[in-house]
Amino acid sequence: LEFRRVLFRSRSPKVAELEAAPSVALVFWCKRLSWQLRIQATATVQRSGPEVDAVWTRISQSPAAGDYLSAKAPGDVWEEDASDAPSDNTQHFLGIVTLQIQNMDWLELARTGHRRAVFTADQWEWRVP
């Protein structure tokens, strides 16, 4: 299973963290359904290439382009007198993270009894909650 197109600023310190340790976990909660979904995945970082170029071509014409043109990296100390003027429109810092999903663990909490199942690419099975 593959989950694509998580966009990021390639100057973010988080990118180096993903490259050093690509195992990730995502946790989602839906209050209305009382469902929790945990996803274990492996991240691959793309800083350049045809896919990044294609996404940038679309984003570069939108207000979101400024998010990927900043002269500063996310988390840098903000200095009142320093400029955060965007770089020219050709030097962007857009990247894509692709997540290869290893498994998904679904849990439903209910007064009538909890349910849990684990899904992989080729099977699923009920588990004790």
Predicted features, each with a name:
Residues 1-7:
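Short, small-residue-biased leader/transition segments that mark boundaries at the very start
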Residues 9-12:
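Mg2+/Mn2+-dependent nuclease catalytic core
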Residues 15, 31-35:
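Short Lys/Arg-rich amphipathic alpha-helical segments
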Residues 21:
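Acidic-histidine catalytic/liganding microenvironments
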Residues 24-29:
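Short conserved beta-strand and strand-loop elements enriched in small hydrophobics
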Residues 35-129:
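Charged, gly/pro-rich active-site loop segments
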